[in-house]
Each structure stands twice: as C-alpha cells, then as structure tokens.
Amino acid sequence: MAEDKELVATVGPVTWDGLKQELMALPKETLAELVNVWLTTYWTLQNYWMVYTEQCFGFESAAKLDELIWSKLVPAQAYRIIKVLNLGHDLQSLATLLKFTAPQWIGAGFAWEFTEVSDRRLAMVVHQCPMGTYRKAQNLELLPCRQLAPPLYIGLAKIINNKIEVTCLHAHPDPAKENVMCEWEFVLKD
C-alpha cells in the first residue's frame, strides 16, 4: 500500500497544502485505509473518554458531558461533510451524511443498514456499535441510547432539512432485541 509511494519528511513547515499533496499521491486504497485509521482512533478515544469520565465522575456527569460535546461536534462535522460532498436537502442527502459521518463509521465497529430509503422515509437499524460492544466486553451497563442518541440524529436530520422528523423506534433501555442495538426512522414532512 504506502510502500508504492515513498513518503519522505523534509526540513521546513508542515502545511495543509503540502500534506494534501502527499495524501493525493497515495494509492486510493491506502488513503481509504488511512481515513479508517483516523475514524477508528476517534471511536477509541470516545470509548475511553466515556468510560474513564464515568469512573471518575459518575454516569450522570459523563452522560451530560458527552451530550454537550456531541451537540457541538455533530453540526460541525455535518456542515463540513455537506460542503465537501455538496449534499442537498432530501433524505438521500441525509443517508449519505449518515454513511460518511464519524458517529456511524463502519470501520470503527458499527454494523448497520438502511431498511428503507424513499423520498419520504428513511429507516435504519444499528446491529452493533463500538460503545455497546466495548461496554458489553467490560461488563458495563449499556448506555441509555433512547435518551442519549436522539440529539445526535435530530441534529444531523435538521441540518439537512428542518422538515425531517426523527423517531427512535428501539434503543436501550428498551427490552433487548436480537441483533438490534437501535432502530431509527426519518420522515420528511410536507
């Protein structure tokens, strides 16, 4: 992969333009893997941050801080992705945003699918998420995603189009469903 193109450090400032040229020279496969490394690292940080904050300050404080952080992070990332991908205001644009946003990154441990994609309704099921997987492995209580996750999905949807309504169809602490962490519905209203 990266062996195909030699990366050499030189004396002088490291700039975005210079780094961008190096990235553009990488094989596409290497670049895609590098993006995956960054986003997987992002989720590793999120998992450790949440667990250690919870250990030090309790669950309520950790959940509140997590909510505050995500309420700022989601719009920042969404606007950047919308700009780069030139997304519109329909449910197809929301589906694209969901695929390319860090909170849904497949390589970081998410397994999910769209179960419906139409002009008026988008539905998705998350089968596995990195936080749930990590917490289960550590014998920790799952996060109450029915309360914590709506601001994330509502935020993403409203940035695409204020007329999109978001409904959580299933999430912890709802009774467990086999192979389902959570289910969401996005409906574009008139």
Task: Spell out what each predicted region is.
Residues 155:
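Surface-exposed charge patches
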Residues 151-152:
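ATP phosphate-binding glycine-rich loop and adjacent ATP-lid/helix-beta elements
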Residues 1-122, 130-132, 136-148, 158-159, ...:
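N-terminal accessory segment detector
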